[in-house]
């Protein structure tokens, strides 16, 4: 299916700001536009963006309830109370549990007073459970701290309070209009909150708690630095924004991982075949993060926490091997379920017409539903919900969005059909009784049909282009400037550029085992620039037209090809078309 191309449009004021920024910073005009698109309007903001400083982290006490939470936690430490840290089973939850555990342990709180609980994905389900509260009661716990969960746990928190336990919630999910009766609720998305940055991960909220605790106990900020590696993992894997405060966390966290990683991260790096000092966002997304996530998907998230709090090499090595095996099992399972799910859609014309794809098979493993939903959303360019049997009469579902569709809002609109749900615009999870599924499917499809952005060419994938370049602007100098935006991630993706009126410079050819890819050697139509190299996955069908010297346009990311013994600028082509096809491809935004 051909993609449409949308070039980001800038207002007159934005163009003026972009031009002024680029001029003052000595950058290409396109870089000025990229900065403005990321909310950067002044020279000072640009300096902070390019050189994030820990001194620019926000005051934790600007968060509602922080003083109450810090005082309660400090009292628990001083009086040697039993504390239970309760976290979700994904990377954000397990890193948040490990962060609090490691810091409290470092504050000389004996481990006999320090406990953690991760719900079992299969037996407990998502969120705070009464089983978890009862576990805390058996341990004599007087303070529970939930991380990456708890913002909707009204019944469970009430139950804990009735049994003499105080409760601090550290969560980043969108709350309802009313809040549960906790001792303190730390959540930057609270409606009454004035904290300057709303896009913290669950682990990020936990970090703000220990930042406040360190301030209360007159401890230097340096005591918090070893925890930054956990923040990097959570921010990357939970796909929260990496602008603002998260950019500070992730920039300094990557420096830490590449200079002084913990023993846990060291062994994960070995399993992922990542050289010391070479950890980047890609290696976190595809090597470290999936291994940590695999325990909660295939067995129990507590196995990940055991690794992340390990202090000795023997424990770290053993636990990392366990997670690696879970990850291998997860890969096999998600590939199998993905094949089955794709076959269901492709064999059902009715499913292919739906604005939102919903698939249910009782035998599918709950642990891979989110991965499968993401794969299908990418393939079919629509939001996808995957459901399977959970326990008793209940089904569990996981969804991923596409095309700007707000999946959380769609599920919330049908929430009276559900037992519980949670998530955000891009991803969500839910629990539903099996007999309510038909009504839920009907209503969420009606909601999807009613949403304007899904009714206008809903099935056409769209490639978002950050800026159009003149062929003469495509250079190693621009690549070096683009790399100043690193680290890349949510809200700061690697820029996609477009240029037009390119022609073959000799050497363009189909490559690959099945000759399905395209290796490009190109110049502008007037041959005024030195030939550029490009590589396009799956676009070899254009080779005959290009080698006949037909003009073409292309969308691409800039990268360095370090193919030994030489290094050269390469355009990683996202899409291309003949110049004659361009008017049909381009749309405005």
Which positions does each model-derived feature cover?
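Active-site cavity-forming subdomains of large catalytic enzyme subunits
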Residues: 134-203, 207-216, 226, 243
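Hydrophobic helix-and-loop "lid/oligomerization" segment in the mid-to-C-terminal part
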Residues: 2, 10-11, 15-143, 163-164, ...
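A short acidic, amphipathic alpha-helical/loop segment
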Residues: 155-159, 357, 372, 481
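Catalytic domains of riboflavin
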Residues: 1-4, 484
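A generic local secondary-structure boundary/capping motif
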Residues: 157, 194-197, 275-276, 374-375, ...
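Histidine-centered active-site/metal-ligand motif
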Residues: 172-173, 365, 424, 517
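Mid-to-C-terminal polyanion-binding domains and interfaces
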Residues: 75, 79, 315-319, 326-359, ...
């Amino acid at each position: 299916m051909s993609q449409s191309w949308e070039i980001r449009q800038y207002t007159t004021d934005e163009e003026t700001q972009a031009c002024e920024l680029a001029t003052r910073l000595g950058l290409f005009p396109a870089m000025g536009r990229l900065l403005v698109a990321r909310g950067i309007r002044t020279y000072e903001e640009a300096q902070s963006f390019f050189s994030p400083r820990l001194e620019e982290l926000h005051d934790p006490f600007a968060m509602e309830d922080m003083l109450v939470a810090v005082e309660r936690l400090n009292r628990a430490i001083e009086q040697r109370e039993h504390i239970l840290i309760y976290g979700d089973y994904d990377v954000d939850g397990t890193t948040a549990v490990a962060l609090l555990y490691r810091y409290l342990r470092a504050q000389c709180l004996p481990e006999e007073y320090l406990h953690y609980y991760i719900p079992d994905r299969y037996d407990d389900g998502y969120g705070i459970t009464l089983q978890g509260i009862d576990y805390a009661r058996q341990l004599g716990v007087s303070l529970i701290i939930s991380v990456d969960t708890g913002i909707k746990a009204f019944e469970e928190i009430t139950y804990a309070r009735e049994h003499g336990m105080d409760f601090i919630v550290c969560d980043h999910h969108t709350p309802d209009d009313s809040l549960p009766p906790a001792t303190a609720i730390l959540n930057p998305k609270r409606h009454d909150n004035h904290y300057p940055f709303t896009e913290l991960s669950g682990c990020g909220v936990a970090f703000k708690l220990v930042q406040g605790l360190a301030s209360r106990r007159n401890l230097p900020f340096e005591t918090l630095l070893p925890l930054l590696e956990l923040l990097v993992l959570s921010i990357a894997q939970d796909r929260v924004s990496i602008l603002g405060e998260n950019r500070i966390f992730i920039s300094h966290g990557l420096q830490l991982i590449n200079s002084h990683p913990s023993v846990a991260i060291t062994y994960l790096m070995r399993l992922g075949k990542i050289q010391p000092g070479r950890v980047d966002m890609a290696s976190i997304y595809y090597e470290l993060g999936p291994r940590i996530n695999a325990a909660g998907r295939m067995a129990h998230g507590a196995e990940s926490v055991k690794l992340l709090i390990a202090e000795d090499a023997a424990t770290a090595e053993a636990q990392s091997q366990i997670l690696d095996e879970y990850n291998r099992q997860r890969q096999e399972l998600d590939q199998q379920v993905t094949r089955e799910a794709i076959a269901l859609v492709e064999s059902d014309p009715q499913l292919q017409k739906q604005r939102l794809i919903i698939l249910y098979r009782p035998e599918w493993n709950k642990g891979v539903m989110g991965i499968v939903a993401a794969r299908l959303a990418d393939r079919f360019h629509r939001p996808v919900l995957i459901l399977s049997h959970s326990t008793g009469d209940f089904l569990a579902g996981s969804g991923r969005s596409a095309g700007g569709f707000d999946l959380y809002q769609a599920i919330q609109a049908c929430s009276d059909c559900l037992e519980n749900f949670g998530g955000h615009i891009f991803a969500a999870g839910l629990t539903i009784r099996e007999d309510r599924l038909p009504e839920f499917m009907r209503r969420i499809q009606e909601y999807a049909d009613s949403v304007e952005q899904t009714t206008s060419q809903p099935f056409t994938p769209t490639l978002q282009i950050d800026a159009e370049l003149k062929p003469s602007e495509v250079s190693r100098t621009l690549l070096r400037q683009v790399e100043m935006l690193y680290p890349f991630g949510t809200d700061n993706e690697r820029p996609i550029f477009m240029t037009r009126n390119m022609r073959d410079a000799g050497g363009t050819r189909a490559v690959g085992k099945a000759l399905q890819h395209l290796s490009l050697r190109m110049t502008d139509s007037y041959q005024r620039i030195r030939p550029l190299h490009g590589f396009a996955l799956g676009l070899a069908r254009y080779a005959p037209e290009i080698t006949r010297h037909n003009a073409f346009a292309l969308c691409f990311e800039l990268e360095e090809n370090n193919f030994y013994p030489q290094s050269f600028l390469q355009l990683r082509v996202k899409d291309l078309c003949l110049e004659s096809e361009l008017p049909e491809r381009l749309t405005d935004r």
